[in-house]
């Protein structure tokens, strides 16, 4: 069983380590649309055995990322995830548990962010993947990802 999660993806524009929240937005220069895939059965087994989740989330084609990028301000418009042209989720930055600035700041405390790194913002919901489905992810009114599940 495979589940999909839509994401707003941030691209870092500079080297960053221990960046304060008030400066964190300066580290982002673009946003993209993304979808990550998780093998739930593999994840459940890894959890049960106390093992790493790598195989459940890091397999071939485990993530889709738009080629088009928008300015960082576009993330304020939020994202829409559609399956077969039906809106299944709306992601609003203001509704996230942690602000983008907090996420970037915290990540920069744990690791050095480098130019071009991608940050997949958390997704509130997962959707079961079905062969033949069409996925679209839009930021604002621009569809950035449009692909079929094969």
Regions of interest found by a model, annotated:
Residues 1-114, 118, 125-150:
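Catalytic-core "active-site belt" of small-molecule-metabolizing enzymes
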């Amino acid at each position: 069983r495979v589940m999909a999660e839509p994401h707003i993806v941030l691209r870092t524009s500079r080297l960053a380590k221990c960046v304060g929240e008030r400066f964190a937005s300066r580290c982002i220069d673009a946003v993209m649309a993304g979808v990550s895939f998780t093998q739930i059965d593999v994840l459940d087994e890894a959890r049960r055995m106390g093992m790493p989740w790598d195989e459940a989330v890091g397999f071939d084609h485990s993530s889709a990322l738009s080629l088009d990028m928008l300015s960082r301000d576009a993330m304020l418009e939020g994202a829409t995830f559609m399956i077969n042209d039906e809106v299944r989720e709306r992601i609003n930055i203001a509704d996230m548990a942690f602000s983008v600035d907090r996420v970037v700041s915290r990540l920069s405390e744990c690791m050095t962010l480098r130019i071009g790194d991608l940050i997949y913002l958390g997704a509130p919901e997962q959707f079961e993947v079905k062969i033949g489905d069409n996925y679209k992810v839009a930021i604002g009114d621009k569809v950035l990802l449009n692909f079929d599940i094969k």
